[in-house]
């Protein structure tokens, strides 16, 4: 049985931890609001850009379409770009993305495909290297980046495009966590290359005028598709930041409440043991008095 001093020290230690988790929750809540606004603002732009590409693609013949849109004509080699957080203490956020990526890799391997992986974020690398160390061709860390910007996404996109141009893969899938709410972040896979053509509404595809493209539609696609890849990566990074902050706020809230419950239990044990010790001392005093 722990002594009164040990219990007192444990109570003080848990209280100190509770202060830290409470502060981390407040910081995450403040960052979440900004991250959520950024993620929600990026969605319409990325969706509309994909729709514009789909509309322009209808005016381009397959034999002159950019390779980034048509692909290599094969699907033998798959590149998975897995985006996770740089730090932990955010519940199951990172493990969910890693599990989703792991399942995708296993599925492709079982189908006889060759899989290559690029990890964006330290936690993704730490989780996947245990099983797929030989498949990871590059790790990208954004630990020193205070605020994720478009330039970070553009660098990742350019790296992916250069690998495609070098013939390193046939299909590229971006894996990230789509932010739904503070308690809901859904791991998602988005095909980057060949550029996935989104399904657009009939009202959007019905042409009410004849468009002339200057330069030609194929040249416009050649320029827009790399930009679209950068935009989609940027959106994924923003979604991840919002999801990470939401998961961290929820995790720190749970930790703060658990610390409170532990403090109550330890305080109860401390009071009971102290009362028992006082009772014992009183009995000894009374017994000594009776002996006299």
Curated annotation (Swiss-Prot):
Entries under Gene3D superfamilies matching the protein: 3.40.1380.10, ATP synthase, gamma subunit, helix hairpin domain
Location (main, coarse): membrane
Subcellular locations according to the entry: Cell inner membrane
GO molecular function: ATP binding; proton-transporting ATP synthase activity, rotational mechanism
Signal sequence annotation: none
GO cellular component assignments: plasma membrane; proton-transporting ATP synthase complex
Pfam family, one: ATP-synt
Sorted UniProt keywords: ATP synthesis, Cell inner membrane, Cell membrane, CF(1), Hydrogen ion transport, Ion transport, Membrane, Transport
Membrane topology classification: Peripheral membrane protein
Entry's Gene Ontology BP terms: proton motive force-driven plasma membrane ATP synthesis
Known function: Produces ATP from ADP in the presence of a proton gradient across the membrane. The gamma chain is believed to be important in regulating ATPase activity and the flow of protons through the CF(0) complex.
Record's subunit section: F-type ATPases have 2 components, CF(1) - the catalytic core - and CF(0) - the membrane proton channel. CF(1) has five subunits: alpha(3), beta(3), gamma(1), delta(1), epsilon(1). CF(0) has three main subunits: a, b and c.
This protein's name: ATP synthase gamma chain
